[in-house]
């Protein structure tokens, strides 16, 4: 469980165009100038909200293009027009930020693309993760009632205190290790997220 440096987003406008354009140059979907501006505004709002959900991430101006942007995620897969984005995100770390030991082989949509189509190809919503963590998280959305969610690997500031503990027991000839979060020095919201993630 740790954080990653923010991915570069200087090319998000051209990545959006690439996702919505066939290799022969024909448009999968031709974004209007209003839609393009709205998508780029969603990206800025996402950064401002530190990756947390909010109604401003689903503007009405994007109703017609949402599905096309979500489907554009297929271009981030191996062999797709945005495969280099996938490769650079996966190359940014050797360890899954959710569990701290798995090899990142997948990209997790921190805010699920099923609910936040506009963010389906936004690099800062795509977190390199191992398969088991990505599968376990699936559509967990931060702020869901009763579910604290996971830390955001790009935006979460973690305190410089040791908060993870390992209790080691040797019982009946077997080693038993149990991990826990020591919450005493942590913000209660962060402590709940870390406990949920553990």
Residue map of PLM features:
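N-terminal accessory alpha/beta regions
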Residues: 2-82
């Amino acid at each position: 469980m740790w954080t990653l440096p923010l991915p570069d987003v200087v090319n998000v406008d051209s990545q959006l165009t690439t996702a919505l354009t066939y290799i022969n140059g024909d448009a999968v979907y031709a974004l209007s100038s209003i839609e393009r501006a709205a998508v780029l505004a969603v990206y800025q709002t996402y950064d401002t909200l530190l990756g947390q959900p909010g109604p401003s991430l689903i503007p009405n101006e994007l109703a017609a293009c949402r599905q096309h942007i979500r489907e554009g995620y297929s271009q981030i897969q191996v062999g797709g027009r945005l495969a280099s984005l996938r490769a650079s995100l996966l190359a940014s770390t050797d360890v899954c930020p959710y569990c701290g030991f798995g090899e990142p082989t997948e990209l997790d949509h921190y805010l699920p693309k099923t609910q936040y189509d506009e963010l389906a190809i936004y690099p800062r919503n795509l977190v390199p993760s191992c398969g088991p963590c990505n599968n376990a998280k699936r559509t967990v959305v931060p702020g869901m009632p009763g579910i604290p969610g996971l830390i955001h690997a790009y935006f979460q500031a973690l305190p410089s205190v040791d908060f993870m503990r390992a209790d080691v027991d040797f019982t009946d000839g077997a080693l038993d290790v149990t991990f826990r979060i020591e919450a005493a020095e942590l913000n209660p919201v962060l402590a709940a997220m870390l406990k949920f993630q553990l």
